[in-house]
C-alpha cells in the first residue's frame, strides 16, 4: 500500500529467481504477510490509533524484527532504527529478502520462510486472545497535528483499497494445496469485501460533494478508517499460515463484522442529511454517485417485497447508467440528481433504524416509522432513473453513422414482433407508429445520398443523423424489453419520447422542403452537368531525374550488394517511386529474383519472411508451420546464389532492418535492395555503398502537372483563368504530392469553373502549407455524410495492409453503411461508394480485375490511415484497443457503441464485460493463428450482446459458434470442429458466414446442418469443403435462400447433391466447389446452374477426373476448371451453354483425344481472357472465327504444347500475350504473333511478355520415402531453381525455375548422383 513499489519490485525479483521454481506458493504467502503488516504498522504511526483503542502490533513486531536480525547475521539494520514500520520497510523487505534471494534453492533456503512464518504465527496467537473491536474517538477530541494526513479522504480510500485487495486474494485462491487457500465460507468474505467497497464509495461521494470538509466529515472518515482496519485485523488474525494448518475465518466473526457495519448506519444518515444543504460540485465522472446507490440484497428488508424490488431495480439502473456519464449531459439536472441520490441513500439506511423488523411489516407502518411516504419518495427516483438511463445511452452513440441503419431496423422490427410477440405486446402500438414514421422518412434519406451538394446539405445531414440516432434508441428499447433489463414504465415512456422527437424532425424537414422549393439550385455538379473524372492508371508524375538516378544505381555501380535507401517526409511518394522502379521492365530483367515486403510500424517478422519467400520461390502453405529461424535460413539459401532485387518498404527503426538484413547474403553479384523510410537515421544505418537519397519536394511545374493529371485525366486544362487558380492551389499544397492529390480529389467533384476553384483556394488558406493533415481534414469535411462512415472505417485496418474489396464491401453492408435503393444490389451501391472515395484520391487502388477493371484490392496512405484512426476515435466511431494503450477500459462506458479493433486476445478478455452495446469487434494481428485454452473465446464474446460484426480474420480460433448473438450479421473466424451446430439458425440476422479450418482440421469435410437453410438473410457462405448433413431434410423441409449470392466451398459427391443445393439457391452469383462423382451417367448430363450465376470455379477431388455434367449457365462470365480430365467434345458441348463467358481459366487439366483441343468457328464469342496453366495439351487447333473478342492470352507451364495457333495473329482485339515455362516453339510462335500484330495490324497496344522459366517433372511412383523427398527439396539453392512442388496424389515432383540448358543439366546430374533417376 504505502510502499507498493518496493513490494512489487520484490515480487518481480522473487519470481525471476531460482526460488520461484521451488517455492512459488511460499513466496506469495510471504509477500501477503508483508502487505498486511504494511497496512497495520503504517496506520499505527499516527496518534489516533491509540485513542481509538486499536490493538498495537508495532511494539510486538519490533521485538520480532530485532530478534530476526540477530538470527540472520547477514541482516544489518541502520543504526538507531527503533520503529516497527521502518524495520519492516528497511530490514524485512530489503535485507531479509536479499538474503533469501542470494541463497541457492538446493540449500536450506526454506529456513528463512519457515522462521518468518513461525514468528508471525505466534504473534497472531497472542493477539487473537486480546483483540476486540476498537471504539470510535469522541467527536470533541482534538485532532493531532501529526495525524492531519490520515483524515484526508484520499488516505482513507487508499487504505480501504489495500484491505479489499488483500481480501480478494482469499476469494480467488481455489487450490486446496495453496497456503492461502480458505476452505471456509468464501461467500461471507466476499460480502465483507463488497461492504468495504460501498464504504469507499461513500467516502468518495462525501469528498466530491464538499471541497472543504466540515469537522463532522472528518469524524466520518476516521470512523471509516477504523472499520476498515477492524476488518483487516480480524481477517489477518485468522489467515492460514504455513506449517499450522488452514485456519479459516470463523462464521461468527463474519457475522459480527456485518453487524458492526449495520449498527453504525446512523453515521451514514447524519452525513447524508448534512450533505442535503450543500451545493453540488460538477464532476467529470459519476463513479461515486453510482457507488452510493449500490444496494446489496441484505440491505433491503424482507417485508414490503414489491416496493423493495421496485426500489432495488431502479437503484441498480441508476448505478449502472451513471458510471462515466459525461457531466455535460446532465449539467442542467445536477441538483436534482444529487437530491435524488441523497434521498435514496437516506431511504436505504433509514430502513435499518426501524426496530422489530418483521416479514409482515406493512406499508403504512413503514411510512410512519420513516416519517415520509415511500411511494411518493420513489417517484423522483423513477424520473431520474429514466433521465440518466436515456442520457447514458445517447451520449455514447457514435457521431458518424451509416444511413443504411434504418433499413436494418425496419426489417428487424417485423422479425422481432413475430418472434417475441408476448414480450413486446405492451409496446405493440408504439412500435407500429414508429415503423410508419421511419418508413415515411426513407425518401428523405434517399435524397440526402443522391443530392449531397444541395444548398441545404448541412441541415439535411443533421436531420439524417438525428434519425439514425433514434433508430439506435428504438433497437435498444426493443432489446431491453425482450431481455427484461429495464422496467416497462421506463421503456414505454422512452418510445413515446422517440415518437415525439421523430415528429419534430419531420416538421423540420417539411419546413426545409418548403424553403427548398423556392430556391431549388445545386451549387456543384449534377449527373447531367459534370462528366466524371476519367479513370487513369497509376502512372507516376514528376521525379524524372530521381528515377533516372535510382535506375542507374540499381543497374550499375558496385559489384557487391548495395542498399538504395530513400527517405523523406510522409506524402512525398516514396512508396510510389520505389514500386515504379521495382516494376520497371528494364530493371526487373536484370535480376534473377525479385521480392518485396512492407514492414510498417508494427510488423510480424514471420509474415515478412513468408511474403519474401512467396515472391522468391512461390507460395507454399506448409511454410506457415515453420518457425522464424527456419524461414530466415530458407530465404538466405534461396538468395545466396542469385542476383536479387528486394524492396523493403516503410521501415520505421533500425531494429526492423536488423531483423531482415541477415537474410540478404552478399554474393558479390550486384544484388540490390531498395529501402524506404521516413527517417534519415534509418536510411543512413541501412546504407552500404550508396548514400541515402533524400526525396525532394515537387517543383512548381511538377505540382501543377500532377494536379492537372488527377483532375483532367489525359486531357489538358484549356482555360487559362482556371489554370491560374490551379497553379495557385498547387503552390498552396506546399509541393507535397499527397496534398496535391487530395486537393485534386476535391476539385474533381466540382464544376470546372473559376468561381468553384477560387472557393477551394480560399478554404485551404495559407495554413495548410506543408500540413497534409489540414488538407485531409478538408477532404473529409466535404465528403457527403454517407461516405464519411465508409472512409473512417478504413481506420480499422493495419498500416500498409492490402484490403480485399469483397471483404470490405461485405463489412460495409453489415455495418449498415450502405443505404438500399430499389432495383439495385447493395454490393453494386457499395462499389459506387468506393469508386467515389477513389475518385477523391482518398483510397489507392492496388489491384484491378483484368476482365472488367473493377477494383479488387486497395490500401490507404499512412497519413490518411492515421487521420481515420484519430478522427474515428474523436467521433466515438472506432476505438483501437492496443497492448500498450495507456488508457484503460475505465475511460469508456459500458454503453459504448463504437466499433472496437483489438490486437491481442487479452485485450478482448479485459474489455468484454465493459462493452455490452458495442456493435463491432474486429481483430487485427499480423500473426497467423491465436488460440488460448485458458479461456473460452466464445463465452467471452457473449458479453457483446449487440454485436453485428465479428471479424476475427481467421486468426482467432473459437471453441464454439456464439449462437446467442442474434444481431450478428457478419461472422468470420477459425474453428477446429468438423461440424456446425444446428443452433446456428438462431443467428437469424446473419448475412455473411466465413469459417476457416485450422491446420489441424483442414483436410476434413465439415458437416453443415440442415438448419443452415433456415437462415433466409444469408448472402455469403464461405466454409472450406462442407457438405449437407442431411440431404433428405434439406430437400423436404428447408426454404430457398433467395438472398444467397456466393458459396464456397461445397463438396459434391454426386450430381444430385449439386442439383439439390442449386435449387435452394436460385439467385446465386458466385460458386466455388469441389466435385467427386464415383458414378456418373454415360452421356453428359446438363446441369442447370442459377440464371444469375456469373462466377464458377470447379475443382476435382482426389478420387475423380472427369466432369460428369455439362455446365449450363446463360449469364456466366467467369469459369475456372482445375484438375479434371477433358476432351474437345466436352468443351464444345459446354460452350454452347456459355454464350456470355468472358474469362476462362483451365488449370492442371489432362486432355483426351490425343491431347488435342479443337476450337470451332463461333465458339467463345464474348471471351476476353484465356488462361491455360499446366495443361497436358500438345496440339491446339483454333478456327479463324473463334475468340473474336479475345484481349489476353496467358500460357503457364504448358510445356507439351507445340505452338500457339497462327489465327491469333488476326484477332484485332488482342492486347496481351504472356508465356511462362513453355518450350521454344511456343515462344517462337508468340513472337510471330507479336510481329504481325504490331507491324502488319498496327496494334500499338499489343504487349508480349515472355518469362524465361523451365519446368522439370519427375515421376516418383517408387521409392518416394521422406528422405528422397528431402533430396528434391535440396534442389532449391541450385542456380535457376525457383521452387519444387510435390503432388503425392499423382506421384509427381515439379521443379520450376529460370534455368538455361546448363542449369537443367546440373539439376539432372544432382538427382542421378542421389540415385533418384
Swiss-Prot record:
It is a peripheral membrane protein. InterPro entries: Apaf_helical, Disease_R_plants, HMA_dom, LRR_dom_sf, NB-ARC, P-loop_NTPase, R1A-like_N, RX-like_CC. Pfam families: NB-ARC, NB-LRR, WH_DRP. Residues 419-442, 535-556 form a coiled coil. One of its GO terms (cellular component) is membrane. GO terms for molecular function: ADP binding; ATP binding; metal ion binding. Residues 521-823 form the NB-ARC domain. Gene3D superfamilies: 3.30.70.100, Helical domain of apoptotic protease-activating factors, P-loop containing nucleotide triphosphate hydrolases, Ribonuclease Inhibitor, Winged helix-like DNA-binding domain superfamily/Winged helix DNA-binding domain. LRR repeats lie at residues 944-968, 987-1015, 1090-1114, 1138-1161, 1164-1186, 1187-1211. ATP binds at residues 568-575. The keyword Protein biosynthesis does not apply. Residues 1251-1317 form the HMA domain. Keywords: ATP-binding, Coiled coil, Cytoplasm, Hypersensitive response, Leucine-rich repeat, Membrane, Nucleotide-binding, Plant defense, Repeat. PROSITE patterns: HMA_2. The keyword Acyltransferase does not apply. Its main location: cytoplasm. GO terms for biological process: plant-type hypersensitive response. It is found in: Cytoplasm; Membrane. This protein is encoded by the haplotype B genome of the allohexaploid Solanum demissum. Belongs to the disease resistance NB-LRR family. Confers resistance to late blight (Phytophthora infestans) races carrying the avirulence gene Avr1. Resistance proteins guard the plant against pathogens that contain an appropriate avirulence protein via an indirect interaction with this avirulence protein. That triggers a defense system including the hypersensitive response, which restricts the pathogen growth. This is Putative late blight resistance protein homolog R1B-14. It comes from Solanum demissum (Wild potato).
